[in-house]
Amino acid sequence: MSAVAIATLVIAAASMAAQSKPNFAGKWTFVPDSTGAIAPIGRGVGLGQEFTAVHDDKTLTVAMKDPQLGELKSVYNLDGSETRNPINFGGQTVDRASKVKWDGAKLVITTTISMGANVAEATQSWALDGSGNLLVETVSSFAAQSMTTKATYKKN
């Protein structure tokens, strides 16, 4: 195989890999399922009823309003390096340290939430379905208990 053919294959493969990563930018609204479930908020990782995402080559920035905490903004580095997005809850600082990785077309955000000696972990997976809806699955664990929530968001 010639060097030109190999170079063409490498460029094509890189281009296809880049295309498989969706862009999550936009304003998103929770879509209730048939059970009437409410939008997941909790343990510092839920996205609530509505949120806005700004997504560029380097970061994903998520802004939402929490009924107890007010406006929350989290910035995630897409290169896998850790980001810290502390929040103030009841006069105490809750540290949130996150790392992001791509699993094909799925964005996976793993966050460690620390408040004093209490530590929890949450892994949130973001993916677009065939209709362009955002599917978010969150697995949270604290004190040997695990909880999984699934939510669908529609882009406004």
Put a short name on every predicted segment:
Residues 2-13:
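Bacterial N-terminal signal peptides
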Residues 17-156:
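Hydrophobic small-molecule pocket/channel-lining residues, especially in calycin-type beta-barrels
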Residues 1-2, 73:
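Generic secretory/membrane-interface signal
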